[in-house]
Structures are given as structure tokens and as C-alpha cells.
């Protein structure tokens, strides 16, 4: 067996998580549409969002490229969460997610249409609370909620 050094996943480089170049993103989404795609789920939840996260860019991209973009709410793996998010109670997490669904993300008018929770194994305390909160959110809003507990290295972000 050979061990290769220097190989990383795209999410390991913080810059790969930036959604701050709408023109470049429109071009990429147009490729997706030409290949037959019609809807993208943008699941940059708490722990994956950075200061450059701008949900209004998603509106611009959706309109320009002619695809649906569903923004997600939720909490990512505990190791990625800011300190204050790690300390939230189940109810505080639920209230935050309901707010993003009913009122919008980060002061924008972009409302979330899905709940995504990052899970590692064994579940960290904040991940367990986030899963519990997601059940409250789904019960209150009817939004889709999910997590893939079989994925430890989230290659689905590639």
C-alpha cells in the first residue's frame, strides 16, 4: 500500500467553499443546465459558511442560469462549528433553523428549503443536539431534513 501525501478534499481548502464570484458560478451552473440539470441544493450550513457567504448571489445565479437553487439550513460537523454554535441548546438550534426557513438567511430574503445536519462517528454533542433540533424544525415547518451518517469524509462536497 502506498501513502500519497498532499492529497486533500476540496472542502479542506477554505477558499473552495467561497461563493463570492457570481459570474464564474453562473458559468459553472450553465454547464450543469446544459448537461440536463435543473435544481441545485446549496447546503453550505453553519460551519461551512464563511464571511463571504452571500445568499443573494444564489438568486442572481439562479435567474441568470435558469435553474432552481435550494438553500439549506443546519449545522455541520462539530469540528467545523464556531465556538458559539457548539454551545447552542437544541431549542436554540431549532429556532435558528426555523428563522432561516421562515425569514431568510443572514438578513436576506433567501429562505431555506431543506435542513442538513453534518454527522461524524461517534456523534459529537453538538451534532446530536443538531439532529434533535432538526426533528423539531421538520415537525414545525414540514421542510425536508436529512443527514448521511454513513459519510465521514464528506466527498459529496467535491
Per-segment meaning from a language model:
Residues 2-67, 92-110:
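Alpha-helical scaffold segments that flank or form the walls of functional sites
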Residues 53-56, 129, 157:
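Generic recognition of short, well-ordered alpha-helical segments
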Residues 11-19, 117-122, 147-149:
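Glycine-rich phosphate-binding "P-loop"
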Residues 46-47, 76, 152:
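Conserved beta-strand edge residues that scaffold enzyme active sites
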Residues 43, 72, 146-150:
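Structural motif
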Residues 148-158:
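Glycine- and Gly-Pro-enriched alpha-helical subdomains that act as flexible
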Residues 39, 60-63, 68-144:
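Active-site gating/metal-coordination segments in enzymes
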Amino acid at each position: 500500500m502506498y501513502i500519497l501525501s498532499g492529497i486533500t478534499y476540496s472542502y479542506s481548502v477554505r477558499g473552495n467553499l467561497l461563493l463570492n464570484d457570481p459570474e464564474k458560478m453562473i458559468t459553472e451552473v450553465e454547464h450543469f443546465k446544459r448537461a440536463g440539470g435543473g435544481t441545485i441544493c446549496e447546503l453550505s450550513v453553519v460551519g461551512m459558511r464563511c464571511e463571504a457567504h452571500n445568499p443573494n448571489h444564489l438568486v442572481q445565479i439562479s435567474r441568470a442560469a435558469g435553474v432552481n437553487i435550494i438553500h439549506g439550513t443546519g449545522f455541520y460537523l462539530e469540528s467545523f462549528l464556531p465556538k458559539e454554535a457548539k454551545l447552542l441548546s437544541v431549542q436554540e438550534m431549532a429556532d435558528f433553523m426555523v428563522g432561516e426557513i421562515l425569514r431568510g438567511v443572514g438578513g436576506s430574503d433567501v429562505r431555506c428549503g431543506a435542513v442538513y445536519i453534518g454527522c461524524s462517528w461517534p456523534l459529537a454533542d453538538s451534532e446530536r443536539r443538531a439532529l434533535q433540533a432538526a426533528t423539531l424544525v421538520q415537525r414545525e415547518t414540514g421542510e425536508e431534513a436529512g443527514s448521511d451518517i454513513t459519510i465521514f469524509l464528506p466527498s459529496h462536497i467535491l
